[in-house]
Design a protein with these regions (language model features):
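Concave beta-strand-loop units of leucine-rich repeat
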Residues: 4-13, 27-41, 50-70, 76-90, ...
Length: 276
């Protein structure tokens, strides 16, 4: 579904949005956004039983959505994107049996998203791809979720230990250096694609962290450590020397990138390493 335009919004405002989704998600999609009063309830969507894609975007600072009741009647809904939701409305997520992809939280605005209890998300039967934007997230609340893709744009994660229970998790993205206790659980995870790239302003986010567990991920195929300034040459050599599936490596603007010529990258299909 692409180039979706929703017209005749309240107040005569035309609103447009590109919705990028799986090509198998055919026609029915709704995008709700604009400069009018914030959306607080989605109850009326119970009448849209053929709806497959729904994206709701409120203004920055808008109050959380208080009512998701009605979404469970959208039996064909596969892709859902919503900003912050009140804790009292979270149980409805557990009833959304058809949703495959969920994007939760105001994109890039961590403070605006309520992430106090995400346990209802683990009960979504078809959920495979989950994007979360918020402050501190407790991954133990997602225990039991059969995820393939997990993207976390959050302030703090704490322990990555629950990832070891996600046996089918293939892609993990940690956006802009969330606080993490240790990378150690990654060594026992099923992750094949790991994105930990940082912005220039967050280059030292993991300056006190041990990257060694990243060298102990036997299923790892693709790794992006762009701007992880303290990822050093010795650790990178260990990563490349280990018997892993690694084929794609991005270490741009890291300490290791300064010594790129010393690295044995012959087995890689793609290697990106501009020096700082």
């Amino acid at each position: 579904v692409g180039d979706l335009i929703v017209k005749d919004a309240p107040g005569g405002v035309d609103i447009g949005r590109n919705v990028n989704s799986n090509e198998q998600l055919a026609a029915c999609a709704v995008s709700v956004e604009g400069t009018y009063d914030p959306v607080t309830s989605l109850a009326d969507l119970r009448h849209f039983d053929s709806l497959q894609v729904l994206s709701v975007n409120n203004r920055r600072g808008a109050p959380p959505i208080t009512d998701l009741t009605g979404l469970e009647e959208c039996k064909n809904l596969m892709l859902l994107s919503v900003p912050s939701v009140e804790s009292s409305a979270f149980p409805t997520f557990a009833k959304l049996d058809s949703v495959v992809e969920l994007k939760y939280g105001s994109d890039g605005i961590r403070a605006d998203s309520n992430v106090s209890d995400l346990s209802a998300l683990a009960q979504m039967k078809s959920l495979k791809m989950l994007w979360i934007t918020g402050s501190e997230v407790d991954l133990t609340q997602l225990a039991g979720a059969d995820l393939r893709v997990l993207r976390l744009d959050v302030t703090r994660i704490g322990s990555l230990e629950p990832l070891k229970q996600m046996e089918n998790l293939s892609f993990l993205q940690l956006c802009q250096g969330p606080e993490i206790d240790s990378f150690a659980p990654l060594a026992e995870s099923s992750v094949q694609y790991l994105s930990m790239s940082l912005s220039q302003g967050a280059q030292e986010a993991y300056k006190d962290m041990d990257y060694t567990p990243l060298t102990q991920m036997p299923q790892l195929i693709w790794l992006d450590l762009t701007n992880n300034i303290t990822f050093d040459t010795e650790t990178c050599k260990k990563l490349l020397a280990n018997d892993t599936a690694l084929k794609y490596l991005k270490i741009s603007y890291t300490s290791a990138a300064k010594d790129a010529e010393e690295l044995d990258t012959a087995h890689l299909k793609e290697f990106t390493a501009p020096a700082p």
